[in-house]
């Protein structure tokens, strides 16, 4: 099959999205010698509607079941304006539109959430900014009466700026993967002259969003050439884990706005374990795990247990 000279890649325009896209391009070029890549920046509903909570953006923008950070990029993919879309996997709904396929995932970064806290904050009386329903529920479970939450929207840089500019807020919650990719891979740093420190949260007690830490590369199902080239960068251990996590999301008919956290991990015997915390409301949750050899079968079994719980 003759090669493709230039792969047109669509992505969001945030600093993190572009960092992830450049990481994907480096992998694609290494796996496909001679390949050139171009970047098309696409503004999504999630980027445009920062005036409302994230879980309300779907209904406000008529994006339906599609992820608010991917629908516009998929439209460009369907129209043939781009050949490949690069996403944060956690932003993707459990089921893709039948016109597209998840051609590859890059090796997964650290999956945990972290608390980014002002250095002088009172740890016994935290005010934590988050736009995530999942994180908000988990704050109350993890810290109890020592923490309250306030809403915030925006990319990593915006949330860090809002943290240091608001004297009433003592901390915010972010994915460690995103901070690492932006160069904040240390225990403390300055934001506009204010010292902040990073506290990693244990994944069993404060589980991440399903799919967190993984970068996804999506293409059209009918584009065999792009799919072949992209598949060369696929990291199979990560793909097994995210396949299990996404199968569970599909069974829940959930997306990134649903209050469920968890992660899959591959064991020494090559079996896979899916660990999940599902919130029915802010104070009631179910913690479950399931182990097996087939990622989708593990997800089905855990979902059946959740239904019976």
What are these regions (language model features)?
Residues 2-52, 56-63, 136-138, 142-309:
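Small-molecule-sensing regulatory modules
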Residues 8-10, 85, 103, 129, ...:
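Short, well-ordered beta-strand segments
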Residues 52-83:
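Short, structured active-site "lid" loops
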Residues 73, 78-87, 166-177:
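Alpha-to-beta junction loops
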Residues 78-92, 212, 216, 220-223:
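Ordered, amphipathic secondary-structure segments that act as subunit-interaction surfaces
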Residues 83-84, 101, 114, 126-127, ...:
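Structural motif
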Residues 89-147:
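A conserved helix-loop-strand patch within extracytoplasmic ligand-binding domains
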